[in-house]
């Protein structure tokens, strides 16, 4: 009766004098307990009731009071936060396992050029360590792919790999994404949210376009890199995480340091190991391997059978300078696969 009411209204209930209450005294569960007063409050998450907290007093001289109701509501709120965090973590575990399967298929660093051989050797040496890695290179060269390869070849490979583009968010939103926020921390923060660093605990976090991060967020990131705990936005609880950081940039961080746009101490913290990914125009011998890899994968995805590239189409790919690097090559081949009509990719595609 009371439980149904709380589930329906989402409001807590304090009931006194149960033995003399006509609606309650014959309830078998209350009779078995010998309850004289009770409290029932919901454990809420957004607009759903996840469960109930019951508190009973069997002593008629020590009836539960309003203060007891407030205390039980506070306990239910804490339980709600714990359950919400557990659900978020469970969701992340499932998502990370799905992504991990995709990563195994996508993390092969395609190429036999001297530059790619050197990259693979660097990854093999650095992956087994806990060192922070700074991946540098032009946009589209595959910096995230390098970060994924480092993670999947490291002792943390069973942990999560969390990726975040630092240039895609405003400073306040980036801080919330990185470190999380408490309910009510700002307009629109209707629920507590764990940040990327918490989500990446025992794993790796990849911070792309780190050079675009604003000074205020840089300072907080530096403290985390130094092993210090952090707090969620709007919170006071200290949170400690064990996370490996791999950062990437396509800007000149040294100039940014000189200009005061990037903290010098953070630069040195990030610049423990540097991996520079060459542009596609500097490893053109890898273009046939990359082109055929993308063709096989993308044609399978759309359900088309394509034999390969015509000689003239491949010569055209080799002559082009690829300012957008591997990303541009992949996009071009995807467009040809989707729009093409023959069993071979030609120069007109």
Show which residues each predicted segment covers.
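Sensor-regulatory modules in signal-transduction proteins
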Residues: 43-46, 230, 280
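Regulatory sensory and allosteric helical modules in signal-transduction proteins
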Residues: 1-27
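Signal-transmission/dimerization alpha-helices at domain junctions
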Residues: 8-12, 46, 71-89
């Amino acid at each position: 009766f009371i439980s149904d009411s709380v589930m329906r209204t989402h409001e807590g209930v304090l009931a006194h004098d149960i033995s003399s209450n006509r609606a309650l005294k014959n309830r078998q569960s209350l009779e078995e307990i010998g309850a004289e007063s009770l409290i029932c409050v919901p454990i809420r998450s957004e607009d759903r009731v996840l469960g109930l907290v019951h508190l009973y007093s069997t002593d008629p001289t020590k009836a539960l009071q309003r203060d007891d109701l407030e205390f039980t509501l506070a306990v239910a709120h804490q339980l709600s936060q714990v359950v919400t965090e557990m659900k978020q973590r469970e969701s992340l575990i499932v998502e990370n396992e799905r992504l991990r399967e995709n990563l195994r298929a996508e993390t092969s660093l395609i190429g036999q050029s001297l530059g790619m051989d050197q990259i693979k050797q660097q990854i093999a040496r650095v992956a087994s360590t806990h060192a922070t890695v700074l991946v540098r290179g032009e946009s589209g060269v595959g910096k995230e792919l390098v970060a994924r390869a480092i993670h999947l070849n490291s002792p943390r490979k069973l942990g999560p790999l969390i990726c975040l583009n630092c240039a895609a968010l405003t400073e306040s939103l980036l801080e919330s994404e990185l470190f999380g926020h408490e309910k009510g921390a700002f307009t629109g923060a209707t629920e507590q949210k764990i940040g990327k660093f918490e989500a990446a605990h025992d794993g790796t976090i990849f911070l792309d376009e780190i050079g675009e991060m604003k000074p205020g967020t840089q300072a907080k990131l530096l403290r985390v890199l130094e092993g210090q705990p952090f707090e969620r936005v709007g919170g006071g609880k200290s949170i400690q995480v064990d996370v490996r950081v791999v950062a990437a940039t396509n800007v000149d961080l040294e100039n940014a340091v000189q200009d005061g746009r990037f903290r010098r101490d953070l630069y040195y913290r990030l610049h423990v190991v540097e991996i520079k990914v060459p542009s596609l125009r500097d490893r053109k011998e890898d273009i046939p391997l990359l082109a055929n890899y993308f063709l096989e994968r993308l044609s399978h995805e759309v359900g088309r059978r394509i034999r390969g590239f015509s000689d003239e189409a491949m010569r055209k790919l080799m002559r082009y300078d690829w300012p957008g690097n591997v990303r541009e090559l992949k996009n071009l081949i995807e467009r040809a696969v989707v729009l093409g009509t023959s069993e071979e990719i030609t120069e007109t595609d």
